[in-house]
C-alpha cells in the first residue's frame, strides 16, 4: 500500500445524505475519502463538518481512486438515472479487477441488473444498495440493503454492517439481499410499503379531524398513546410531532400545508411491478393513486362545489371509534406488509433470487422509515418457517387480524357514511376478504371473456363431465344452447 492509499472506502456525492454517511463512517473508525463533482463542496465539507475527523478529500476522480485501499470500495450517492451511468463511465477506466462500485441511490432495479452485467465484463464488482433512514439514519445508522455481484460482499460486509443501524440483540440492519438488482428491488418494495403506511396514517388522521372534529393536539395525543403499543413505529412517532408543530401565529403548521402530495416514483415502480407480476399489491397501489388524486387540487375544489355526498357529523361513541381506528390501522398495516412480502416472493421466483425474508424484515427493524415494532414479529415468523407463504398464515398475524377486524369493518363503514375517503384502509379490507374467499365471482368473468372473445375457460373438477371435460380449455357458443365445445390455447 502506498502512502496515498489511506481510505477504507470512498464516497461520491456530498449532499446531506452523503455527508452524513461519511461522518457516520468516520465516527465508527473508518478513514473515508470524499469527492463531489462541484469540488468547492469538498473543501467546504472538510473545513466544517469533517474538520478534525478521519476524512480526506479529492478534487478529481483520479485523486479519489488513488486514495482508496485495495480492493477499492467506491460508494455513489448521487441522483438516480443518467448521473449514475456518467459517473460509472468516469470511474471504471480508473479501477482494477476486483474493485467495487456501490450505488446507494434510489435506482430502479433493472438498471442495477444491467450495470452488474456490464461491469462484470470488466472485472469490476457492482453492488446496488438500498439506503433507508433519511438524513438522521445516514448519520447514525441506516438500514442497508445490498445486492448485486456476490463476490463484493466479503469486502463490503464489515463496512456496511458497522455503518448500519442495530436492532434486537445488536444485530445489524444489513445483510446480503441477493444477486443482480435484488437490493434495489427490496428497497423499492420498502418504499412502496412506506407509501401505504403513510396513506393509512393520513386516512386515520382525516377521520379524527373531519369526522370527529378533533384538534391537531388531540389527534397527536392519540398517536402518542398508540406509539406505546402495537402501532409503535417511526411514522407514528413523527406524525405526533408534525401535528404538534406550531407556525409563528401559534396555529398548527400542518393545517397551512397545501394538500397536494408529491412523489419521486418508487411507489409507482412498486405498483407497476405488481401489475407486471400479476400480484395483487392493492393497498400500495391505492396509496399511489391517493397521491395522484391529491395533486388535482383545483379540480377537487371545483368538484366540491358540484358533487354532493354525505355531510353528517359522527354522533356515536367517540372513544369506541378511536379504538376502532387503532385496530383498522393495525390490520391494514399487516395487509400492506403481507402484500409487500408476497411481491418479493414472486420476484424471487421470476428472477431466481434467494431472498431471505427474515433477514429483510430484520433490515427494516431499525434505521429505516418503516421501522416498527411488529417487524420483529415478521422476522420471527420467517425464522420459524423460511417458506411461509404469507405472514397472514402465521398465528401472530392471523390472531392479530382476527381481533382487529370488527373495528376495521366499522371504520370502513363509518367512513363511507361520513363521506370521508379511506382508499388504502378499505382496499386492505377488500383484499383480506378476497384472500380468505374460497370462491370468487371470477367464474362469471371467465364466462364473459369467453362469450365476447372466445378466450376459453376451465371447469371445476367436481363439475366436470363428458360435455365439460376437466383440465381442458373450453369454448362455448353462448348464443345457442350448449354444444360447439372446442379446445383452444388459453389466453389469460
From Swiss-Prot:
The keyword Ribonucleoprotein does not apply. NCBIfam families: gnd (TIGR00873), PRK09287.1 (NF006765). One of its GO terms (cellular component) is cytosol. Keywords: Gluconate utilization, NADP, Oxidoreductase, Pentose shunt, Phosphoprotein. Belongs to the 6-phosphogluconate dehydrogenase family. InterPro entries: 6-PGluconate_DH-like_C_sf (IPR008927), 6PGD_dom2 (IPR013328), 6PGDH_C (IPR006114), 6PGDH_Gnd/GntZ (IPR006113), 6PGDH_NADP-bd (IPR006115), 6PGdom_BS (IPR006184), NAD(P)-bd_dom_sf (IPR036291), Pgluconate_DH (IPR006183). It catalyses: 6-phospho-D-gluconate + NADP(+) = D-ribulose 5-phosphate + CO2 + NADPH. This is 6-phosphogluconate dehydrogenase, decarboxylating. Catalyzes the oxidative decarboxylation of 6-phosphogluconate to ribulose 5-phosphate and CO(2), with concomitant reduction of NADP to NADPH. It comes from the Eukaryota. Substrate binds at residues 106, 132-134, 190-191, 195, 264, 291, 449, 455. Disulfide bonds: none annotated. The modification Phosphoserine is found at residues 107, 215. Homodimer. GO terms for biological process: D-gluconate metabolic process; glycolytic process via Entner-Doudoroff Pathway; pentose-phosphate shunt, oxidative branch. Its EC number is 1.1.1.44. Pathway: Carbohydrate degradation; pentose phosphate pathway; D-ribulose 5-phosphate from D-glucose 6-phosphate (oxidative stage): step 3/3. It is an enzyme of class 1 (oxidoreductase). The active site is at 187 (proton acceptor), 194 (proton donor). NADP(+) binds at residues 13-18, 36-38, 78-80, 106. GO terms for molecular function: NADP binding; phosphogluconate dehydrogenase (decarboxylating) activity. Gene3D superfamilies: 6-Phosphogluconate Dehydrogenase, domain 3, N-(1-d-carboxylethyl)-l-norvaline Dehydrogenase, domain 2, NAD(P)-binding Rossmann-like Domain. It holds the Pfam family NAD_binding_2.
Amino acid at each position: 500500500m502506498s502512502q496515498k492509499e489511506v481510505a477504507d472506502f470512498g464516497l461520491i456525492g456530498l449532499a446531506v445524505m452523503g455527508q452524513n454517511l461519511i461522518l457516520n463512517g468516520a465516527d465508527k473508525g473508518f478513514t473515508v475519502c470524499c469527492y463531489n463533482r462541484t469540488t468547492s463542496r469538498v473543501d467546504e465539507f472538510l473545513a466544517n463538518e469533517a474538520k478534525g475527523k478521519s476524512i480526506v478529500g479529492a478534487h478529481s476522480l483520479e485523486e479519489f481512486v488513488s486514495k482508496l485501499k485495495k480492493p477499492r470500495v467506491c460508494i455513489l450517492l448521487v441522483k438516480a438515472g443518467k448521473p449514475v451511468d456518467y459517473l460509472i463511465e468516469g470511474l471504471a477506466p480508473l479501477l482494477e479487477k476486483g474493485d467495487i462500485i456501490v450505488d446507494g441511490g434510489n435506482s430502479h432495479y433493472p438498471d442495477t441488473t444491467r450495470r452488474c452485467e456490464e461491469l462484470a465484463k470488466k472485472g469490476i464488482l457492482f453492488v446496488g444498495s438500498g439506503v433507508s433512514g433519511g438524513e438522521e439514519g445516514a448519520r447514525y445508522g441506516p438500514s442497508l440493503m445490498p445486492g448485486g455481484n456476490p463476490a463484493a460482499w466479503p469486502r463490503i460486509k464489515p463496512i456496511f454492517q458497522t455503518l448500519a443501524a442495530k436492532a434486537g440483540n445488536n444485530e445489524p440492519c444489513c445483510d446480503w439481499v441477493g444477486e443482480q438488482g435484488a437490493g434495489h428491488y427490496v428497497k423499492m418494495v420498502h418504499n412502496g410499503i412506506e407509501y401505504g403506511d403513510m396513506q393509512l396514517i393520513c386516512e386515520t388522521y382525516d377521520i379524527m379531524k373531519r369526522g370527529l372534529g378533533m384538534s391537531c393536539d388531540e389527534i397527536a395525543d392519540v398517536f402518542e398513546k398508540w406509539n406505546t403499543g402495537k402501532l409503535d413505529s417511526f411514522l407514528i412517532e413523527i406524525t405526533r410531532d408534525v401535528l404538534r408543530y406550531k407556525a409563528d401565529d401559534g396555529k398548527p403548521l400542518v393545517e397551512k400545508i397545501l394538500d397536494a402530495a408529491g412523489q419521486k416514483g418508487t411507489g409507482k415502480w412498486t405498483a407497476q411491478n405488481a401489475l407486471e407480476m400479476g400480484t395483487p399489491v392493492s393497498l400500495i397501489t391505492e396509496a399511489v393513486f391517493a397521491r395522484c388524486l391529491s395533486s388535482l387540487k383545483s379540480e377537487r375544489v371545483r368538484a366540491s362545489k358540484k358533487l354532493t355526498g354525505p355531510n353528517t357529523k359522527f354522533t356515536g361513541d367517540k372513544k369506541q371509534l378511536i379504538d376502532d381506528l387503532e385496530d383498522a390501522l393495525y390490520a391494514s398495516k399487516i395487509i400492506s406488509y403481507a402484500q409487500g412480502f408476497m411481491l418479493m416472493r414472486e420476484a424471487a421466483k421470476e428472477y431466481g433470487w434467494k431472498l431471505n425474508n427474515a433477514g429483510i424484515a430484520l433490515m427494516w427493524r431499525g434505521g429505516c422509515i418503516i421501522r416498527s415494532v411488529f417487524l420483529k414479529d415478521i422476522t420471527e415468523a420467517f425464522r420459524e418457517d423460511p417458506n411461509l407463504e404469507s405472514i397472514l398464515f402465521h398465528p401472530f398475524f392471523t390472531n392479530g387480524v382476527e381481533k382487529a377486524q370488527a373495528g376495521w369493518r366499522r371504520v370502513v363503514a363509518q367512513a363511507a357514511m361520513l363521506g370521508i375517503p379511506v382508499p388504502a384502509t378499505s382496499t386492505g379490507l377488500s383484499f383480506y376478504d378476497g384472500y380468505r374467499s374460497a370462491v370468487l365471482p371470477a367464474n362469471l368473468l371467465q364466462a364473459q371473456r369467453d362469450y365476447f372473445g372466445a378466450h376459453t375457460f376451465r371447469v371445476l373438477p367436481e363439475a366436470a363431465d363428458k360435455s365439460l371435460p376437466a383440465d381442458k380449455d373450453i369454448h362455448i357458443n353462448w348464443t345457442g344452447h350448449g354444444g360447439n365445445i372446442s379446445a383452444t390455447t388459453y389466453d389469460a
